[in-house]
Amino acid sequence: MKRNITTALLITICSTMLGQSSFVPKSWTTSTDENGTVYRQSDGLTLYKHTKSSDHFDVYYGTGYGKTAPDKLSSSNALYVNVTDLLNKAESFYDLYVNKLKFADLSIKSKLNQYKMIICLLHDTGWTATGSGYDNTIGALWVTPSTCHPVGQTIAHEIGHSFQYQVYCDLGGYTGFRQSVGNGSTFWEQTAQWQSVQAYPDLMISQSIGLWQYNHNYAFTHEWQRYQSYWLHYYWAEKYGIDAIGRIWRGGTVSGEDPCQVYMRVFGVSVKDFFKEIYDYASRMVTYDMDAIRSYGKGSIGKYTYNYVDTGDGKLQVAYSSCPQSTGFNVIPLEVPSAGTEIQTVFTALPGGTTLAANDPAQYNNGEKYTTANVTKYNNFSEKTRRGFRHGYVALLKDGTRVYQSADTVYAKGHSTSAVNDTTTFVVPENTERLWFVVSPAPSVYIVHKWDENITNDDQWPYQLEFKNTDITGHVPYVDLSDTSIKPSDVTFDIYVGFAATTGNDYTGTTYNLTTAQLAAIGKALRIQPADIGKLMKTYSANQAKNTINLVPLNPKTNAVVNSGSTANGYGHWFSKTGNVCSWGNDSYVYSELDAGTLTFTIGQYPNHCKNGEVYQLGQGFRYKDNDGNVATAKLIFHIYIGGIPAGIEEQAYPHPLPQGKGAMFNLQGQRIGTLQKGLNIIEGKKVWAK
């Protein structure tokens, strides 16, 4: 017995000292040439036996390198690779994926204890990067030199695939997501991206945001966002630990399960609780409010596209292109009313397969662009009878605090053949900077999304919204223009903005988006649909054409139109210290430029001219000339506070005259007044400045 123990100990020590051995795939045949051993794959790829290795990787060079190894070439040569750096980085990824993310468990029978992973460095000036493995035994990757200039996130991604492949090599069964769900398994790409940005977290946003902002309403596992939709990985990792994703990859025991099904089984989560988590995840993703991503997501807060249709009866209906799938969600930006205001949302769940709203272009994003679906209804699918929704509010305060409000309620469940509505309320907190309404489906059954490149058979959960005391940011309302006897008329708005003085070459200031109420008032006054304002904009002309809008400057004393073309970029003007339109130069202090596509004003300054504490005024107007030659102007008077708007002055813009029912107005002595007076007024308990 003593002799046997000694022998076993000796074998263990020798194995440890020898380390992992090189693995030669079955598909490789061996020969030699003047430069040494040559391996030839069945597909014709030829490689030289490795000349450099590390603890866990062997590197094989394409035979095109001949006698000159890739790291012996000039660094300016396109085929040059710093192989030492490649191996060092590969070892760091190995350590991350094994010891932190737990894609392999070396304490059990793992083939990583026996063999080194394989890197095939191809002799090719093109771009190739693929990760997988050989013979269900060991992970491998195939890369060209261009992917190693420098070695970084691309190699981390492909070695991630190598470890995904390794899961099944070590555990077999239904682990490793080898079975396709439809035409493939999107979880491979999602996870490889997530793995790679664990090594390069500063890339997590740039690798995702371009498409994620358009397609987040799609299923988590949708093929058209498979490289961008790795954010649920972060939610699971925060909830269960950084090794949660590795546990999901290693946890498959049932044929054909997708990652969400494996997740629910591994962590004991019911379907109902799963969709409760999806809503919580969606709410946090509005502001990237998870520990691992919060600091990186600051610049992308709220950057989600939401397409909808104004039905003309006060309701807004989700467009086909934004209709959420069961593991997708919608982020709906809202205008921020005064603190303490109670806002209401009437949410109406529509039946699956409902006819699209009039004017819905019926488009979808295919991962590259928006294209037409050629449908007149939302998708019809068998699980539509299992309807349910979760929804609520997210507020971001000025100090960065997030406020979440939602009831633990599944709305509209079980009513699959009719529209069902509910009303939720939210009191706007003090110091709210931004506000959103979040919607995510919560059906009573989990729906597997299959990769098939066909939008029309995906599940969709349509609905309508109606708001009180707020509206969707940038909502361009529909106005009733049926009474053709009403002629265009002037309307005036006072708008208050603030920003700090600048020096050097800094011309920045702030931006201002016209509110829904302002757009509606402009449309009613000028007798045009607000959605047409940008379309009707034309370059200034003294002989303005009919059915066009010119952006014109205003006289600072009388608010009368000043006949002047643009003196700034595009539709824009520079203004002097006294508010008169001028050209760029020594007399210019502030400017305003309009983006006609978004109806956003960029308001800035001439550096070194403005001083903190000073107040400037500029006026611009949408001058509209209708088909009968009638002319009217919507006048915007911007009051610009350098250094910021003083506390106590209401930032909301009110039109002149105030809309009916806006509320009582008082002067600072508490006396009720009928019209706004110059200076400070009190409207609905708030101080408002009027010119």
Q: Where in this protein do the model-derived segments appear?
A:
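Terminal processing/anchoring signals of secreted or surface-associated proteins
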Residues: 1, 19, 648-651, 670, ...
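C-terminal tail/sorting-segment detector
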Residues: 1-3, 680-691
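Zn2+-dependent metallopeptidase catalytic core
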Residues: 20-57, 61-138, 145-159, 163-167, ...
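Zinc-dependent metallopeptidase catalytic helix centered on the HExxH motif
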Residues: 139-207
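Active-site-proximal alpha-helical
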Residues: 212-291
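Beta/coil-rich, acidic/histidine-enriched accessory regions frequently appended to metallopeptidases
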Residues: 257-490, 496
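A short beta-strand micro-motif common to beta-rich folds, especially ectodomain repeats
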Residues: 611-627
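Residue-level detector of functionally pivotal "anchor" positions at catalytic/ligand-binding pockets or at interdomain
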Residues: 643-672
